[in-house]
Amino acid sequence: MCAICGLDNLYGLQAPFYNMADGSVMSLFSYKDHHQSYPGRVHGGLISAMIDEMGLRALWAKHLDESLFGVTMTLDTKYRKPVPYSTILVGKGVITAETARSFEADSFIYDREGTLLANGHVKYMRLAPEIITAGSDVHEEMPYLIADDVTEI
């Protein structure tokens, strides 16, 4: 079960993602108290995991095609301010470069007031989903749409 999007993962973020008209992806999500490192702060690894997830989902949002996949080659995260848990945060991912073999994305985590808390640049190698998921139960690992009433972020 995915630690970021897995709806059945009780210890994960269970983060929803929204494809935007400009080809970016957005998320309204909240870290939980069991995601802390120091009191009042989210663990840096979980911040990086969200930065990574938004990059791949930005590819899907740009092309409106969830059959496109890749695996992370490099991840450069910058921690700007402490990221709190138990509060709604805003995530955004945007594709910045694409080739036949790879793609790159910039991802951002903001508080509700628009203050940048963390951001990152991710490079991915394109890889077919059947190679990535070989031998796995893919229910939580593959995207599927869930209807909701969100109309604006």
Each PLM stretch: what is its role?
Residues 1-34, 140, 145-153:
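Non-catalytic linker/capping segments at the edges of enzyme domains
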Residues 12, 72-74, 102-104:
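Short coil/loop residues immediately preceding or within conserved phosphate-binding loops
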Residues 18-20, 94-98:
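Short beta-strand micro-motifs enriched in acidic
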Residues 26-53, 66:
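A conserved, well-ordered hydrophobic junction motif at loop->secondary-structure transitions
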Residues 37-41, 70, 115, 129-131:
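A short, polar/proline- and glycine-enriched secondary-structure boundary/capping micro-motif
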Residues 55-90:
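Hydrophobic beta-strand-centered segment that forms part of the acyl-chain substrate-binding groove
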Residues 84-85, 96-153:
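HotDog/MaoC-like acyl-thioester-processing domains
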